[in-house]
Amino acid sequence: MNIAVFASGHGSNFQAILHAIDAGLLPARIVVLISNKSDAGAIEIARAHNISTQHLSQKMFSSEEALADAILEVLEKEHAEFIALAGYMKKIPAHVIQQYQNRIVNIHPALLPSFGGEGMYGRRVHESVLASGVKVSGATVHLVDEEYDRGPILLQKTVTIVSDDTPDSLAAKVLKIEHEIFPRALKAFAEGRVKIEGRKAWITS
């Protein structure tokens, strides 16, 4: 399975995917790294692994449609079959979602459908989780549709919140399980073990 990874930041989830591929745990190949930030750490990781990189930002285009066309041109050129959003902080254009329906997944640092939606990313998520008083948090891998964090949930794993947790300590715990479940979800897709029916998605054995 040829995967295009989209990332905006340091690229730790991107790195986790690469580790899984290198270890023979994920039968896939990363064909391109696309980022909306020219200085994203993920770009350096891609270059170190001789993976093609593309900087594509809405600021470079006159409309969302123009950005979508540019993204789709890159995906076609690189023969990308699947898209993994690994810390990508921008909404995917609707036309890209339509062309890759049920072939885009995102990793979110909380247990959706709680603590998701527009603007809920990074430290903000963990601050909101702790402020709510819930006793568990976690990570969610979900399919991407045209609403923020509303696509069918595929995989989740929890962490326990303790009384002295801070946004930073909770983020570290959640990030650890993100690195575990994201490659696992991609492996299920690569092996054809994902079933999707309406708003429900699950992995078969």
Language model: regions and residue ranges:
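One-carbon transfer enzymes
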Residues: 1-205
